Amino acid sequence: MKAIIAGGRIPRYHQYADKMSPKEYIEGVKRREIHDPTLSFQISNDFQVKLVSKNYLPEDNESMGYATILVWHNIYYEPDQSLLHSRKSYVRIGCVQWQVRPYAKMEDLMESVEYFVDAVSDYESDFILFPELFNTPLMGSFNHLPAVQAIRELAKFTPDLVEAFSKLAISYNVNIIGGSMPMIEDDELYNTSYFFHRNGKIDFSHKIHITPSEEYEWAMKGGDKVSIIETDVGKIGILICYDVEFPELGRILADQGMQILFVPFLTDTQNAYNRVRFCAQARAVENECFVAIAGNVGNLPKIANMDLQFAQAAVLTPSDFQFPVNGIKAEATPNTEMIIISDVDLSLLVELHNYGSVQNLKDRRKDLYEVKLKPAVKKPGTEAQNNGI
């Protein structure tokens, strides 16, 4: 059953008819300033008053002839779907805690990537998340160059890496969040996360907020698009490392229907990691979504700006009775190369949105404040570009 539509009496309205209109009476019942034996019961069971009908029952003197037209929506209703188009409730996520080590060639790096993709796909995972700038070991060949030139040399690998990742997503039937890679667009350098659909489609998102180190060492620029990605199992968002520390971005994605937020990160110290971790946990609570984070571990002593790494991958949840008491669904051992795999139940988010102990999204005071994305400013001489490839 999808919904119930009903007409209802307001039997105590006759006691207030000389003081207020039917609509004012109904608002008083909603605020619990007035108790109506019929309407109070209906409202407490999530019936919503859509309109007031006059002369619905003229002989109902207690209701003064008025009646409410109410609607009750069944949040558990699922329309019949063919097996080809149905979406499952449980989604399996794999996070790679990636050990940085020297690689002489791109092929050597991709051999390690394929190992993890193969391992995660063996568990029939829907997603695999790699860390931010996981491919920086390839910069070792450019140690003789200034950092700002070395990172641009690294960006030259990106087109080939994108092609290789896309083939893996198709071959192993798993959606891949390819961490992030440097990308050159219109001669500007961006920190870009690619999403490789297992059907062959590719989406990408630029990092919005560039850290002082990225700007000073590498002259990176921030992107200007924030949008969810529709996948075969749900709606996801990607925020790269520092971006998760800005709650506005998570809220914009939540308003677009995001169910899972993926955060590839790169942090050098435990302090930096905790900033990402604590903010990721907050995004899960305030946006009523799951959050998966994954970072690099180990050391790259001969590569400028990449010498230290600290990480602890995790899958985080909202905080309510349906979820783990500490909001942690799965967690890696700190600073150890490994994979974590966890199932998340998207149907629990629907339950939380409607019946949670608190309802952060629903209870916002939109009469007082709002968070919205401004239109992207188009660069002179360029056309607006889509997120997809």
Name each region found by the language model:
Residues 53, 199, 205-206, 327-333:
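Short hydrophobic alpha-helix segments
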Residues 86-100:
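Short beta-strand segments enriched in small/hydrophobic residues
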Residues 2-89:
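Terminal substrate-recognition subdomain of acyl/acetyltransferases
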Residues 64-70, 190, 224-226, 308-311, ...:
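Short hydrophobic/aromatic beta-strand or adjacent loop that forms the aromatic wall/cage
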Residues 155-177, 245-337:
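CN hydrolase (nitrilase-like) catalytic-core segments centered on the catalytic cysteine
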Residues 167, 183-260, 269-282, 358:
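Active-site catalytic loop in hydrolytic enzyme cores
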Residues 297-389:
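C-terminal beta-strand edge segments of enzyme domains
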